[in-house]
Amino acid sequence: MSSSDSVQRWEQKWSESRLVRRVPADQDAPRRRLELAELNVARAARERAAGDADAALIFAEQALINAADALLARDGYSANSHVVRFSYPRLPAVYVSERGLIDRIRSARNTAQYDARDSVPAGLAAQAIQLAERALGEVRAVL
């Protein structure tokens, strides 16, 4: 099965629920999203150094989203769901190989953002930043 077939099946699966849609080509969109990912990784590192693991993880998770969105934008898509976004077939392998960690990051982000402060372990925040840096590098390499 080709990459095009995988993308076509992905689009068909999610477009009916309106969680993914085609968007007009915008050559600057991938660059803008990568810049935002870089900014969010820097914010994550700054917050971790300041001792705020919650904020560090939230920014690192956002960087993962921004990097994935750069590839989606390059290919003319916009996703309204993390499940949809992170299942895009053309994402670098890190998004598949680290799926368990991404799920833990997402869950911890939800708790930190909506339920309870000081809920993110410092080690998980550090892992989130490392993963965001790795994903950003892999996305940059394929753009």
Regions found by a protein language model. Give the residues of each.
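Terminal alpha-helical segments
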Residues: 1-143
